[in-house]
């Protein structure tokens, strides 16, 4: 699959505009037909575009999209990738553009992806004193953020938005009160004891999920429950890594009504009201 030069330049402009506006990189860049090019793949396209211009003194007519494989690599295969990478650098005096997953096979990763795998491999060895059993090809959610660390200390470890939801379901409590009333550091203390409401939960867990690398929005809704009444409610819409864009992540579903990830706390009726919290907001 490939895109023409004009389309690529438009993607590049939108990527740069997003970075300037949001002070971070987007999770993906879309083509004109809606295909999502994930950030590592787009950055590899950008590198190849810049290499072509530098070498040829002109822009290419098109840039190919080379989706990288996903999944996990056993440690034995990763060691072989590392050996081939080091051999290439020693022989050629430079790094390779791509590294094949297995010698003689076509599946490969870009240099940037491989170096991220290598970084995560070294981090694991440093922290655990041993090699991992496997290395994930694509970057995994980060667990190093301030609020992520605080939540892990309180409820135990998790590795993505799905396992976080399950930990919340097992360890946290819901308590009804109006709107947001406590800052995030208090919410962390109360979520496993007296409990917190949907608003304070959204403020806290939106921070956690954003630190992990997900796209997160707080949604203001009305839900109709089994008693036939409508209630104002806040939940999260989350996308990235293992979750499809816009997946419902509802603290009250996890802690009170016991529904699975992706389902709102009440299912008899659902109305979208807006985005963000209406009223005072702590910990902006």
Curated annotation (Swiss-Prot):
Biological processes, Gene Ontology terms: defense response to bacterium; killing of cells of another organism; proteolysis
Primary enzyme class: hydrolase
Region (Pseudomurein-binding repeat): 4-31, 34-65, 70-100, 106-137
Statement: the UniProt record of this protein carries the keyword Coiled coil: no
Similarity field: Belongs to the Psimunavirus Pseudomurein endoisopeptidase family.
One annotated GO molecular function: peptidase activity
Note: PsiM100 is a defective prophage of methanothermobacter wolfei.
Binding note for cofactor: Need a divalent cation like Activated by Ca(2+)>Mn(2+)>Mg(2+).
InterPro entries assigned: Peptidase_C71 (IPR022119), Pseudomurein-binding_repeat (IPR018975)
Protein name: Pseudomurein endoisopeptidase PeiW
UniProtKB keywords: Antimicrobial, Bacteriolytic enzyme, Cytolysis, Host cell lysis by virus, Hydrolase, Protease, Viral release from host cell
Subunit structure comment from the entry: Monomer.
Active site (UniProt): 198, 233, 250
Reported function: Cysteine protease that cleaves the cell wall of its host methanogen under hydrogen limitation of the latter (autolysis). Cleaves the epsilon-Ala-Lys isopeptide bond in the oligopeptides of pseudomurein.
Domain comment in the entry: The N-terminus contains a cell wall binding domain. The endoisopeptidase domain is at the C-terminus.
Entry's EC annotation: 3.4.22.-
Cofactor(s) of this protein: Ca(2+); Mg(2+)
Dependence of activity on temperature: Optimum temperature is 63 degrees Celsius.
pH effects: Optimum pH is 6.4.
Species name: Methanothermobacter phage psiM100
Gene responsible for this protein: peiW
């Amino acid at each position: 699959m490939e895109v023409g030069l004009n389309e690529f330049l438009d993607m590049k402009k939108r990527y740069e505009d997003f970075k300037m506006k949001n002070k971070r990189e987007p999770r993906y860049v879309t083509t004109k037909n809606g295909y999502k090019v994930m950030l590592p793949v787009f950055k590899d396209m950008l590198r190849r575009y810049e290499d072509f211009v530098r070498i040829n003194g002109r822009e290419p007519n098109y840039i190919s999209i080379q989706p990288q494989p996903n999944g996990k690599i056993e440690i034995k295969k990763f060691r072989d990738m590392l050996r081939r990478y080091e051999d290439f650098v020693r022989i050629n005096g430079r790094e390779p553009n791509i590294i094949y997953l297995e010698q003689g096979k076509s599946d490969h990763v870009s240099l940037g992806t491989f170096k991220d795998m290598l970084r995560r491999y070294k981090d694991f060895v440093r922290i655990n004193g041993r090699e991992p059993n496997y290395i994930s090809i694509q970057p995994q959610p980060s667990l190093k953020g301030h609020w992520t660390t605080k939540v892990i200390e309180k409820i135990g470890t998790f590795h993505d938005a799905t396992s976080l939801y399950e930990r919340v379901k097992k360890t946290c409590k819901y308590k009804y009160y109006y709107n947001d009333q406590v800052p995030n550091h208090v919410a962390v203390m109360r979520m496993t004891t007296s409990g917190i409401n949907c608003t304070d939960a959204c403020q806290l867990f939106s921070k956690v999920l954003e630190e992990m690398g997900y796209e997160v929005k707080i949604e203001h809704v009305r839900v109709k429950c089994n008693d036939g009444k409508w209630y104002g409610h806040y939940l999260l819409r989350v996308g990235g890594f293992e979750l499809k864009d816009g997946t419902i992540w509802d603290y009250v579903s996890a802690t009170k009504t016991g529904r699975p990830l992706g389902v709102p706390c009440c299912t008899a009726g659902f109305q979208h009201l807006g985005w963000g919290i209406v009223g005072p907001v702590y910990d902006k």
